[in-house]
Amino acid sequence: MILIADVHGAVTKLRALVAATDEQLVVLGDLINFVDYRTMDGILAELAGRDWVRRLIQLRTEGRIDEARALWSKVREGDANDLQQRTADLIEAAYEEICGALEGADAVVTFGNVDRLEVLQRYLPEGNTFIEAGLLEIEGWAVGVVGGGVPSGLRVPGELSDDEMARRLSALGPVEILCTHVPPAVPQLQRDVVGGTQKGSQAVLEYVLEHRPQFHYFGDIHQPQAINWVVGDTLCKNAGYFRATGRGVHHPAA
């Protein structure tokens, strides 16, 4: 199987991967591109401009969440209904395009913190499988999947509370492979060395330590301090920033 994460609107790269492989594809969330921290591109830039996005990124990177919220509130000071409609239209267009690249892929897809579940499921082509949280057998492996991001303070739709993440993980029971969008709360895996943010899940870490899956695959951190890290008996591996690399992780490794 091939696992990818953080597609963020990389339509051409995703279409090329689907065309080039006959392996089972697993997509670990964040299909659309709200904001690219490298280029300032994305839906937010179309709504508010790159200078605004640059300031938002600065505030988020510095952990000034209240100021980031205030900055977003300023954008909404105009016609709120118009802004809401423009945002919805851009999201719909983004999902239509990226999900179109999964035509014929027969992929397993979960969600990340930026994803809108209802829209994602509506545009996902027939033959692909959306899984919010649950168990699968893939190529003979017992696989547990739990989508969703960790709380950021910005009330992003795809985020889960710590308690809800723990509840969904607990419902899996033991698995051989754990797939999540977020990393475990391990400093080397949760820290983005470029953005300076840290987004690890304590619930995921506790699950890994308790149930000891052989492998844990995840995304969310685009430029991690470490790609691989052994936690207890589990090899934890970042599936990579697909928008930038166009590559996934093969399991089992060749």
Regions found by a protein language model. Give the residues of each.
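Short acidic, glycine-rich surface-loop motifs adjacent to enzyme active sites
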Residues: 27, 32-34, 41, 172-189
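Structural motif
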Residues: 3, 25-28, 145, 177-181, ...
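Binuclear metal-dependent hydrolase catalytic cores centered on His/Asp/Glu-rich metal-binding motifs
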Residues: 139-177, 196-203
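Conserved beta-sheet core of the metallophosphoesterase superfamily
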Residues: 106-109, 126-127, 189-254
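Beta-strand-turn-beta hairpins that frame and shape the catalytic cleft
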Residues: 1-2, 135-145, 176-177, 229-235
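Core catalytic region of metal-dependent phosphoesterases/phosphodiesterases
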Residues: 4, 9-138, 239-242
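Histidine-centered divalent metal-coordination motifs
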Residues: 6-10, 113-114, 181, 215, ...
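Surface-exposed cleft-lining segments at the edges of enzyme active sites
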Residues: 79-88, 149-159, 189-195
